[in-house]
Amino acid sequence: MGLDNLKVGLAQMLKGGVIMDVVTPDQAKIAEDAGAVAVMALEKIPSDIRASGGVSRMSDPGLIERVMDSVSIPVMAKVRIGHFAEAQILQSLKVDYIDESEVLSVADSSYHIDKRKFTVPFVCGATNLGEALRRISEGASMIRSKGEAGTGDIAQATKHIRAILSEISALTQAREDELPARARELGAPIDLVRETARLGRLPVVLFTAGGIATPADSSLVMQLGSDGVFVGSGIFKSEDPKAYAAAIVQATAQYDDADLLARVSRNLGQAMPGVSNLDVRFSSRGV
């Protein structure tokens, strides 16, 4: 239990911040200089994964190590859902966090990784409270609402964060004798359901991901109740990555200051091109 608390505590340290996808050490330095609390090292950002199709896997360990060597902030890396061997490799590299990610191809359609067997904290995606609690029961130390990565479209991100938070709100209104039935409906352990009802929030940090492309997008999900944001394609597919990175960090930290939001949103150049008609929905993977 001590290790679990330590891992959850490490994830709590990222609260209120921005985690940025990077594919080179230079991009990692841009993210760090802009004030990112962590970077996600991968070979392709989600929009390129979406465009190229095929099977997407864990990134080359050499790339991950080069990113780790280039920055002082925490480094995350992605593994396929259920691929515990990829996770073992990342743990051996001493990455700071592992993301069991629906953005990559699914390795096991029946089981997620048993994250309790690892010393590294895990991040997992969810579209609703049941998914979130199941991932936490497997050992996830952070949940991110999935959204639709690589689209630049915030619609699914807002849908998923609203779904999770509204289901938590409903739990807090339930009587104690109703919670076992709620647990069955959610497909989640009763102890986690009770803890969530008592806390009025998840027992781990809840970030938002998928489609965040502007400072206003970040402000929106923070005002809805997110603890922080992941930004993938939105930074390095924009016209001015340095400016967008800095602006989104400021917007996340001071999300309720409309004057600041207006100021940091000025003269940023073109945001990433958006994709709204999806042939592949990453968010449907790994429920």
Curated annotation (Swiss-Prot):
Active site as annotated: K78 (schiff-base intermediate with d-ribose 5-phosphate)
Lineage top rank: taxon: Bacteria
SUPFAM superfamilies assigned: Ribulose-phoshate binding barrel
GO molecular function, one term: pyridoxal 5'-phosphate synthase (glutamine hydrolysing) activity
One Pfam entry name: SOR_SNZ
Database matches in PANTHER family: PYRIDOXAL 5'-PHOSPHATE SYNTHASE SUBUNIT SNZ1-RELATED (PTHR31829:SF0)
Protein name: Pyridoxal 5'-phosphate synthase subunit PdxS
Native organism: Tropheryma whipplei (strain TW08/27) (Whipple's bacillus)
Phylogenetic placement of the source organism: Bacteria, Bacillati, Actinomycetota, Actinomycetes, Micrococcales
Record gene name: pdxS
